[in-house]
Amino acid sequence: EPYLKNRQIMRFKDAIYDLNNNVSQPGIYAIPSELSMNSPLVPMENPDPVYGPYIRWDLYKELGYPQIDALEDLLPVLKQMQELEPAADNGEKTYAFSFFKDWDSNLMNAVKQPCCFYGYDEYGFVLVKADSSDYQSIIDPDSLYVRVLKWYFDANQMGLVDPESSTQTFESFETKYKEGQLLFCTWPWVAQPAYNTQERTKEGKGFMMADIGDMVIYSYGCSPVGNQKVVMSIGSKAEDPERLAAFVDWLYSPEGIRNNRAQTSGGMAGPEGLCWEYGEDGPYLTDFGKKALLGEDVEVPEEWGKGTWSEGISALNYSTVASCELDEKGYPYAYLLWDSVRNMNISPLEIDWREKMGAETTMEYLQKNNKILVSPGTGYMAPQENSEMAAIRRQCRKVIQEYSWNIVFAADEAEFNRLYEQMCKEVKELGYETMLDIDLWNAKKKEDARWEAV
């Protein structure tokens, strides 16, 4: 704590103390991430949500923008898109869907993502609606999780699922978007940076969000107390804790915020004077910034240290503040939210999407059409589970993961049903209902904390 006294990071002192009040010994042991001065009801994401139905818009346009009323209606559209472009530029077969196991936790991660199209996110073995109006056990036959399992099963029966999904890594998954082998993505922050190169978007090609008639996308609200699960700390055996504290303070300064997140596509704007400047109408990108921030690995001028842009940018995957935060002059730190950038060299892809959707950005469309549901930000931390409960959870999640993958790739509907019933039977024998009760209790406590923050 003495190392942070009178430093600028203490403008976030309420959030810092909120986190450290949970520690038995007084003092400051950690700084939360993704801090925000905004209301908990303000979406943290902009100009795109974390989740959404992102498709190859050029192929969707070629089909005449068919109406998609519900999740299930998307499959025949994706099949027609696959028929329009059966092979990628590298000669490999195209698929709508591809998965990987790296991020599986209490469930199959790829199945959880489309649940977010309907305002739900996971909490243990529970799907929680952003407005706290519904709580679902993931294995309930009427749950969204089971609905998406069936959706992916149907997609696989139609030849829309990449058969390499169960053995590949995230890196392989991402590469397939770069190569044009995939036609759908639940994450704009994967598909768009990978596929939407300037060359392709000039041709009208790229991933953009399509509308599903009944979707209401889950959005993470800004948290005044930040993300208390991902924190910044100084080790007890650090040789120079005062110097490290100065570095942490810099990371949370306006300069540090911009420079640290400049490596992320659509992130912060990088160094002032090199990547951007303030003009009469607000911030704008320099010629160097346009190239570097939009994916070109340019040479850095000698006065800035020489070398290439990719060699010098931060490799720290850590967000000190929310993407929607404003700087000291009232402009967003995230350059994609600047008026000068939003209207800069708009590609034929973006022009067509804007004309069809009647909005300049995805978030603007979702907000105008009441298709987003914000979960208020909070720093609620669940009590730590004892060893017995942790063991039951490990066993249940292992069963749910393995069966979920097998269900998606089941040979036919009879096998789908058999595997689903067997999954439910096995986890219940392991103690699933006990864990479900714990998760429901914690989920409701977290929701109470969210609305208290509002």
Map each language-model feature to its residues.
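Ligand-binding "clamshell"
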Residues: 1, 195-217
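Short, solvent-exposed loop/beta-turn-alpha elements that line the ligand-binding surface or hinge
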Residues: 1-12, 121-143, 217-220, 275-302, ...
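Carboxylate/His-rich catalytic cores and anion/metal-binding grooves
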Residues: 1-20, 78-82, 92-129, 181-200
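Helix-loop-helix "hinge/cap" segment bordering the ligand-binding cleft or interdomain interface
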Residues: 4, 23-108, 128-176, 185, ...
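Histidine-centered catalytic/metal-binding microenvironments
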Residues: 403-454
